[in-house]
Amino acid sequence: DDLFPVSDDHEIMDLTSFGFAAGTPLAEALDLDDIILEIDNKSMTNRPDLWGHYGIAREISALYDLPLAKIEAYTPPANVADFPIEIKDTDRCPRYIGVKLENLSVKASPFEMQSRIWRVGMRPINALVDVTNYVMLALGQPTHVFDADNISDGITVRRAESKEELLLLNGKTLELSNDDLVIADSESAVALAGVMGGAKDSVLDTTSNVILE
């Protein structure tokens, strides 16, 4: 419990596959003896390029003339599934990118990823959700996964209707105003843009098709 205080889960873990010798300290075996630097975001609110681990590494690389590992670019396959996206408020959202992934199975993330998410104070959920949080922490780019089977007729980026309600992932219901920007389908808002997703389209153990925002 002291190693993973932010997790509500309790389970027995078989450590045989890790291959370390008996007597190895648990923190060393599970790579939990690293150093964590906590940087107060108030000191760099004007530097969004530093809002991720890679940005901090790039800054340190520039200051101390150290080598910086490159991030490999990924080109999606040409046969990506078609999914309609419409932006109705281009002033507040000039660009929206999403890709549909089909026939997936929701599994637990690899232990290394879970461990890294734990260590920065977040809670692992499953591989699909964890990878979006992992990318956000690494690159400072928030992403989100929608259950595609619960999205009706594509994605629309629009202003919320006055007093429109949205049930968030954390169980809270918001009463929105026309100043709020939402991600919506043809029926209702499904996420508060740039803030939090809604419960309607959340990824569950039964999810097999997703929209990666």
Stretches with model-predicted labels:
Residues 21, 132-205:
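Conserved mixed alpha/beta core segments that line enzyme active sites in large multi-domain catalysts
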Residues 2-4, 10, 19, 43, ...:
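A broadly conserved detector of short glycine/acidic/proline-rich loop/turn motifs that flank catalytic sites
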Residues 64, 68-164:
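Glycine/proline-enriched, intrinsically flexible loops and inter-domain linkers
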Residues 1-77, 211:
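Phosphate-backbone binding interfaces of nucleic-acid-interacting proteins
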Residues 27, 31, 42-52, 89, ...:
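Catalytic cores of large soluble enzymes that bind and process phosphate-bearing ligands
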Residues 19-28, 82-86, 195-196:
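Short amphipathic beta-strand starts and helix->beta connectors
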Residues 36-40, 52, 59, 98-100, ...:
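Structured core elements
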